[in-house]
Amino acid sequence: MPQRHPQPAHPADGVYFGLMSGTSMDGVDGVAVRFETGRAPVVLAEAFVGFAQSLRDALFALQQPGDDEIDRESVAANALVARYAVCCHELQRTAGLSRDDVRAIGVHGQTVRHRPERGYTRQLNNPALLAELTHVDVIADFRMRDVAAGGHGAPLAPAFHATVFGAPGDTRVVCNLGGISNITILPAEGSDVRGFDCGPANALIDAWATRQLGKPYDDGGKFAARGTVHAALLDALLDEPYFTAPPPKSTGRDLFSAAWLDAKLAGFAQVAPEDVQATLTALTAVSVAREIARHAAGCKAVFVCGGGARNPVLLDALRRALQEAGVLATVDTTAALGVPPQQVEALAFAWLAYRFTARLPGNLASVTGAAGERVLGALYPR
């Protein structure tokens, strides 16, 4: 059987909120979900609260070293948490909940540095302020406990994926196409669940759309659809050691930044903007497909979540890339498994809050490379 966490010995059943703002930095996804031992989680409400451009600019600026970072980081964290609180209040309103109905809020924060090789990962957050604004217990800082145990602190969602999406006798891959792409391999046989970051996804696709169109993202992949994949540029983009590094591994904007893209584009000034976009879309698809071919060649189904699930051009590119890599797998979204793709990441952090409350581990050492399974998170009481 695939590796799975046991059911809580001391149930912490109840309603939890999960908040996730990913590397696309466009806003926060939230869910209200009820967890009961031995039953599938039940989503009571979902919400999305966007970020103002001024906040997005501040968050993007913090991705790179700069002056007076401590002050800028603290001010941005407070503005970020104000949006988190709005999301929580919207979840309460939609689900008809009082604050006393909610056991805890699991909040990821906004990653501004991810350098586990140097012993840290930094998620911008102010959980104390969120507890004050919502009057609900807040559980945050999930990644550092895994890093402290020698792991990458990422990805953390595979433990949740194994609980919700695993099927005995059926090898599946769950692929999150957020700012960064990552996969979870749920094997049919009794081997461990595996998962890791594959490379850039919407982080570069969105950045190029913003630069060329003045829009925050490539709506439906229409910009990419106007172009043609430039083979030489794709080869240059794939000429990055991360793509062939063995797992466990994780990455982020620290590596796959606008500066990285500009350096790769330096010798391709003649390539039309729409062809660059088509090639960035292909980069995401090919990097994911090659990792699946290396580590889960026998999988029959790939289920996509994250913002990329709303990009049909990207999904078609993934289908083609899998076929070219020799992987005979269907590609669908997690909606086919009963979970809308935009909910998956927020659900994972609600689940991690549930695990913390039960004092049960939330990581998989087979995924992150940690010395063992650990209880993840820190509590900020209401």
Swiss-Prot record:
Alphabetical list of SUPFAM superfamilies matching this protein: Actin-like ATPase domain
Keyword list, A-Z: ATP-binding, Carbohydrate metabolism, Kinase, Nucleotide-binding, Transferase
InterPro entries for the chain: Anhydro_N_Ac-Mur_kinase (IPR005338), ATPase_NBD (IPR043129)
GO BP, sorted A to Z: 1,6-anhydro-N-acetyl-beta-muramic acid catabolic process; amino sugar metabolic process; peptidoglycan turnover
Sites where the protein binds ATP: G22, T23, S24, M25, D26, G27, V28, D29
GO MF term list: ATP binding; kinase activity; phosphotransferase activity, alcohol group as acceptor
Keyword set includes Transferase: yes
CDD domains on file: ASKHA_NBD_ANMK (cd24050)
Pfam families linked: AnmK
The EC number(s) this enzyme carries: 2.7.1.170
Name of the featured protein: Anhydro-N-acetylmuramic acid kinase
